[in-house]
Amino acid sequence: MSDENFTAGTFVSHIASNDSKSLLEIFSISTGVPILYQIKHQFFHRSGFVYASEFQKQHDVEFSKFPSLGEIAVQVNSMKAKFDIAFVDPWHEIEDSFQIIEIALKQLHSGATVIMHDCHPRNPDLRAVSAPEVFPYAWCGSTWTAWSLLTQALTSDFSWMTIDADYGIGVLKVPETKSQQKQLMRLMLSLSKRWTSGNLLRPEWS
């Protein structure tokens, strides 16, 4: 599969085996929706959620009809279903990127896979912290920063990788044991809290 055709959406289809029967998708309206149509695998159960960030709601009245990520969290975490794969593409701020992983982790089976888009954009312009004034426009923002902070904090007990294609595809396996799952969730909550309180430094690009 060439780099030109290897996208986050096609990667989801590629790794989905007969054992991967369910897919959870959570997207920001401006950054993730087009990828929905790249996923060709036929899942037995597929649930998708689209939200608008507070920034989007404040700058364009059209986005006010979409729920916030907090409202999406309530919807997703009220489901009884558990999923084999979660594919997330957040509004590209660190807070949203951390929160969307937390939401997904709560709804996944042991051994499931989290896939996040825009985790390694090589073009420095795409890594601009500020959102572009006009969409559609290629922008990866600080999602790579959140992914980097997470993976740097993980011990060797956790399985993850970053694929250098389609602006970077982050892949994280949900641990098999309950103790490690709780450890991962505690880490996510700690990173989010430390970033919000200003006690976490932004990593250098590498």
Predicted features and spans:
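A short alpha-helical cap/connector motif
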Residues: 1-87, 91-206
